[in-house]
């Protein structure tokens, strides 16, 4: 599942030969029309289904049922891989949303992500100055101009706490900056 694919910028990184089907959960109507175009232009028709919904369970679960992915037996462990790229910074309830997404992973499934995070100024690679700048940017309207993006989330920690993991790979990038990132994956226990 591709969570918050926007216009489909990540589709070029998916391997059409190994993917059976991708379900893209995109809540923005403005992005959906562009996503449909990208899917067509990249040759993903028949292998990429756009779901007009958000990542939150109350929106996502009905969309997955409509696709026939969640059956009457209630089993929600349906995805081999869930990809989140710069989207978890914008969901209203990140901890609950991530927990809901993790429940959709099959045992051994991967939760892959690339996300903005809070500057970890208390670590050796963090920066108190950058953390102060980050805080000021947030105070002076970052969220309202950047589609709800919250730069002050500890997203990797939220993912860590959302499930039982048997393996993980994390890389922190530009830790010293006011807009640091973390990317990597967690493999669900099982």
Q: Model-found features: residue ranges?
A:
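Short conserved AdoMet
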Residues: 15-19, 92, 106
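A short acidic, Gly/Pro-enriched loop at the edge of an enzyme's catalytic core
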Residues: 60-82
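A short SAM/SAH-binding and catalytic strip from SAM-dependent methyltransferases
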Residues: 77-93
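A short glycine-rich, Lys/Arg-flanked "PGG" loop and its adjoining helix->strand segment in the class I
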Residues: 95-107
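C-terminal alpha-helical "lid/dimerization" subdomain adjacent to the S-adenosyl-L-methionine
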Residues: 114-183
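C-terminal lobe and adjacent flexible extensions of AdoMet/dcAdoMet transferase-like proteins
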Residues: 182-190
